[in-house]
Amino acid sequence: MKILITNLGTTVDNIASSSILKRLKRRMETTNITWCVKNKADKNIFRYNKSIDKVISLEELMILEDTFDLLINLDPFLPHKICNKVKIVDTLGFGFNEEVNSFESVIKGDKQMKGMNIFQMYYNLAGMTWKGEGYDIGYYPRSKSKKTRAGVAVANANLRNYLTDEINLDSMKLWHIPFKKNIFKKMDEINKCSKIVTDDMLTLHLALSLRKYVYFLRINETNTKIEFFGNGEIYEVPKKVFE
C-alpha cells in the first residue's frame, strides 16, 4: 500500500506527527510511505527515519506524477489543488474529514485543546486511536549520558535565575545546551544529560524522544496537553519573573 503523508508545519509538528508511523508500519508491513514537508531543508528531519521510504518537499510534490492508495493530510495549509497533481484513491485528514477540521484552529494557534495531547490529535487526523506511541525520529545520539548532569536550554534570560532558585536539581552539574540548528547535533547535546530544563518546545520534544526527564518552563498556555510519558513536569512561570 502506498501512502502519502503531508505536513507543511514546523520541525516540532513533524517530529510529533512522526508518531503515527509506528502504527502504520505495524498495521501494514508492506506499506510504502512518502512524507511531504514544506521546504527542501525540512527533509533533513527524517534523514535517519527507516519507516519512511521517501521524503519530498512541497515543490517536489507539485511536479510529482504518481498514484497513492491513501493521502493523510496533517496540515490545514496544504493547497488542495496541489494534491490533484497526483492520483489519490482514498483520503484522510484536513480538507477530507469534517470531524477533524476543528483541529485546524489548534494547529494555527487560535484555540487550545487541553484535554487532548498532540499525539492524539495527529492519530485522529490519520483515522486511528493513539495508544501511547511515542516519537519515530530514527536517530540514535553518539554522545553518552551522565546521571549527574542537568541540561539547560533556556532562551529567555529572565528564566535563568528563576530555574536555579525554584527547581530542585539535587545539586546536579548544570550543562548549557548550545544552540544547534541541526536537530541531530542538538540531540547529541541533550543526550549528555539525564535531566533537561527548557522553555523551548523543540528541545522539549527532542528530550522526551530521548526519554529524558524534562522540567518545562511554561510562559504561555500550550495549544495541546503536553504528554511527558511519565518523564517530566510543567513549571508555570509567574508574571512577576518578567517584572
Where are the predicted features?
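Catalytic machinery of carbohydrate-active enzymes
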Residues: 1-243
